[in-house]
Amino acid sequence: MIALIQRVSSASVTVEGKVIGEIDKGLLILLGVEQGDDEQKATRLCERVLGYRIFGDDDGKMNLNVRQAGGNVLVVSQFTLVADTQRGMRPGFSRGAHPSEADRLYQYFVGQCREQGVHTETGQFAADMKVALVNDGPVTFWLQT
């Protein structure tokens, strides 16, 4: 499972012209689910993402996680994160989990974020989404379990 996390001042996701998820300060989490991923990996990745210290403290040092910084999260499924890009001119997606399993684990990950007490907004699995964000930094990290 892969999470591309971006520290944002704001972010939103729109489907069919309607905003379905929106946050101010926090993390935009683009989530890719691979074959072999399970609840244990999703739980571990959620713990890492929510605990990752990428927000500035009073001295400006990256020392606070999203909860400590009073931020929110917007979780958006993105199967292209699991693409095989090693060869050729076209990405391959054979490493991606079957859509039904990917959706289940995406929903599980979202549930884990909410159980941790972080306000969590979402995109819509398998939809054509328009994601808007204002990067803060920019600060972007790739986390993988």
Swiss-Prot record:
Its main location: cytoplasm. InterPro entries: Daa-tRNA_deacyls_DTD, DTD-like_sf. It catalyses: glycyl-tRNA(Ala) + H2O = tRNA(Ala) + glycine + H(+); a D-aminoacyl-tRNA + H2O = a tRNA + a D-alpha-amino acid + H(+). GO terms for biological process: D-amino acid catabolic process. It comes from the Bacteria. The keyword RNA-binding applies. This is D-aminoacyl-tRNA deacylase. It comes from Pectobacterium carotovorum subsp. carotovorum (strain PC1). The gene is dtd.
